[in-house]
């Protein structure tokens, strides 16, 4: 079901120890070339948690991962719709991948050896989201 006013997306930073998973989409995802974090629009009435599980399974073949919602972004996108982006961290049990039909490439990168921002879709937005959440994950929790 298309909506001309809202865009609801689940966006997943998949981390395994010091590596992050990036994908390239074969269908001109968002009309953008380059690396993405696995993501997709939510289906009608789909909960963001269920969307994250679906995306991991359908896009990269990951069925066993711990998921954590870390941020909800809100902004007006290039298509003038209100975007709500549900950013998740995913911690799969293994690094084994199986790409789905919309994914042309999936690759694990060491966090400190990620492609340049220019090699990411949307002017490096996925890289900035990934680094923000990956670095926050590595920081010890504040004590009270």
Say what each PLM segment does.
Residues 29-34, 101-144:
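Nudix hydrolase/Nudix homology domain
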Residues 16-58:
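Conserved Nudix-box catalytic region and its N-terminal flanking loop in Nudix hydrolases
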Residues 73-97:
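Active-site-adjacent beta-strand/loop module that shapes the phosphate/pyrophosphate-binding cleft
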Residues 1-21, 41, 72:
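Conserved N-terminal beta-strand and adjoining loop/helix that marks the start
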Residues 42, 73, 92-93, 111-114:
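Hydrophobic pocket-lining residues within nucleotide cofactor-binding pockets
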Residues 62-71:
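A short coil-to-beta-strand element that immediately follows conserved catalytic motifs
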């Amino acid at each position: 079901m298309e909506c001309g006013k809202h865009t609801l997306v689940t966006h997943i930073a998949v981390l395994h120890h010091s590596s992050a998973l990036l994908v390239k989409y074969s269908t001109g995802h968002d009309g953008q070339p380059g690396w993405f974090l696995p993501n997709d629009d939510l289906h009608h009435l789909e909960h963001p948690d269920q969307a994250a599980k679906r995306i991991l399974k359908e896009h990269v073949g990951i069925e066993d991962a711990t998921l954590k919602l870390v941020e909800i972004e809100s902004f007006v996108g290039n298509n003038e719709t209100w975007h709500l982006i549900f950013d998740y961290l995913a911690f799969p049990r293994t690094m084994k991948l199986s790409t789905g039909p919309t994914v042309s490439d999936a690759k694990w990168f060491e966090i400190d050896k990620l492609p340049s921002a220019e090699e990411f879709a949307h002017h490096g937005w996925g890289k900035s989201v990934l680094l923000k959440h990956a670095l926050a994950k590595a920081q010890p929790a504040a004590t009270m």
